[in-house]
């Protein structure tokens, strides 16, 4: 990027000093790093122990729509949308405008028929499992300000421009494909950062729902009031066994914690090596340079070098790649051994600076 003057990066990337240093090294130009730039629309945070329906109702009364209710499963998002559709979310004018804006969209599938009914009530659904035409329709209606509530997954937190005033997190945990775990700071800030519409709002709102057992306990406490006898008799519910829980302190910690530093994930693959070979020249050296100039740790670089050696050997043995012998150096003796070309090739594959490598030529 020698001619690039500005590189704008997401604030959720964490510490980017290593990236700035890499840019300086590759371009030869000084790189000034600007961090902690103020948000155009500041955020307010609230941790609530009301039911989700109650939270939505209160937010609507306070004029904090549109709301995006974040779930961590597609089924949960649809279930909430169907529940809220019975609460009269949209006004008559909004429902008529939605109906007009949705003309031309085919709702022929089973999910499409459900979505059509939900949209007619002012409730949208958004997740990666939807057909593109449905997802784009919801985004378009939201951009036009016609949907007071959208129920979806955390996909909206990644690169989709939909104006939202309030983000409601139904949980601070998610299943990552292996286990249930609490949200990481980067994930939280990506989702929370969707709140607040630049040019419309003076602030955005981020609300986190307490776990179900905590909400039930809050109801029991409210019912008992200030009566000491009733308060003593309360049997507080506990989190289910094996449940990964969270609390207000978890929420506050996520707010205060800076996003984790972005970690490089360079992989050397057969297709990558073949692509480099197709360019001609010393392919192995270019792969080495790619690894060496990456932001991986020294240990990771050593593993990538071993992996590159394995791939080159496999491609050569299978005949996919043919090794061209390196010509003798100009100052090489004329009576050099017949294997000098091979020795030079091997030497080019050995990086003496790596303490984890041992090369031997016989």
Predicted regions and their residues:
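A short, conserved structural fragment
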Residues: 316-327
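Loop/turn-to-beta-strand initiation segments
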Residues: 3-7, 66, 146-148
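Conserved segment of the helicase C-terminal RecA-like domain
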Residues: 184-221
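Conserved interdomain linker/interface between the two RecA-like ATPase lobes of SF2 helicase motors
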Residues: 17-83, 124
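A short beta-strand element within the Helicase C-terminal
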Residues: 149, 156-172, 205-207
């Amino acid at each position: 990027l020698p001619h690039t003057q500005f590189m704008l990066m997401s604030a959720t990337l964490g510490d980017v000093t290593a990236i700035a240093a890499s840019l300086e090294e590759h371009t030869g130009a000084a790189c000034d790093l600007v961090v902690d730039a103020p948000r155009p629309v500041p955020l307010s945070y609230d941790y609530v122990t009301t039911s989700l329906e109650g939270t939505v109702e209160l937010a609507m009364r306070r004029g904090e729509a549109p709301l995006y209710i974040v779930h961590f499963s597609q089924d949960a998002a649809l279930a909430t949308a169907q529940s809220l559709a019975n609460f009269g979310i949209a006004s008559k004018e909004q429902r008529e405008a939605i109906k007009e804006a949705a003309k031309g969209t085919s709702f022929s599938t089973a999910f499409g028929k459900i979505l059509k009914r939900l949209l007619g009530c002012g409730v949208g659904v958004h997740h990666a499992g939807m057909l593109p035409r449905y997802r784009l329709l919801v985004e378009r209606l939201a951009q036009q300000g016609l949907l007071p509530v959208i129920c979806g997954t955390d996909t909206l937190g990644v690169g989709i421009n939909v104006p939202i005033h309030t983000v409601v997190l139904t949980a601070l945990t998610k299943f990552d494909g292996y286990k249930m775990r609490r949200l990481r700071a980067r994930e939280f800030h990506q989702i929370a950062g969707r709140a607040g519409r630049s040019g419309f709002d003076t602030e955005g709102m981020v609300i986190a729902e307490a776990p179900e057992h905590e909400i039930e306990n809050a109801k029991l406490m409210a019912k008992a009031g200030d009566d000491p006898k009733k308060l003593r008799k309360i049997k507080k519910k506990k989190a289910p066994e094996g449940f990964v829980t969270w609390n207000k302190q978890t929420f506050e910690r996520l707010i205060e914690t800076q996003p984790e530093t972005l970690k490089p994930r360079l992989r050397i693959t057969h297709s990558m090596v073949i692509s480099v070979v197709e360019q001609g020249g010393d392919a192995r050296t270019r792969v080495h340079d790619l690894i060496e100039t990456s932001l991986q740790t020294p240990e990771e670089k050593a593993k990538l070098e071993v992996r590159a050696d394995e791939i080159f050997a496999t491609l050569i043995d299978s005949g996919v790649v043919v090794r061209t012998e390196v010509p003798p150096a100009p100052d090489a003796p004329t009576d050099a051994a017949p294997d000098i070309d091979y020795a030079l090739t091997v030497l080019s594959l050995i990086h003496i600076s790596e303490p984890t490598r041992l090369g031997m030529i016989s």
